[in-house]
Amino acid sequence: MLIEANKLIKLYIDKEWKKNIVILDASWYLPNAKREPIKEFKNTHLPDALYFDIDQVSDTSSNLPHTIPTKNQFEFNMQKLGINNDSHVIIYSMDGIGTSPRAWWLFRLYKHKNVSVLNGGMKAWKAIN
């Protein structure tokens, strides 16, 4: 489930990594945090990372925020990110481990087998780079 930052660096060095690995920033904050994760993502993110928008990857027909998406909604959103069943998805968040477990759990809920969370998130990445 967890991948360490030093192992992720080794994957980046291997030129073949882009064939199967998709890196997602799943950062999200409560409204009172007064932080905008999409803006933060645009300013700084892991190389080649994509943004996993929990507001979009939820059941948009519900009146409640961040409800579990249907399987079709989840698959549609993952296909837009270029993710398929063969992808090894590595998820991180800006604040340590924060919100990345929620994204990991959604992948596991819908039977995606190869998904990991970057242990320590962006903080761990920056600590060794």
Task: Please place each PLM-identified region on the residue numbering.
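Cytosolic catalytic domains that perform sulfur/thiol-centered chemistry
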Residues: 1-129
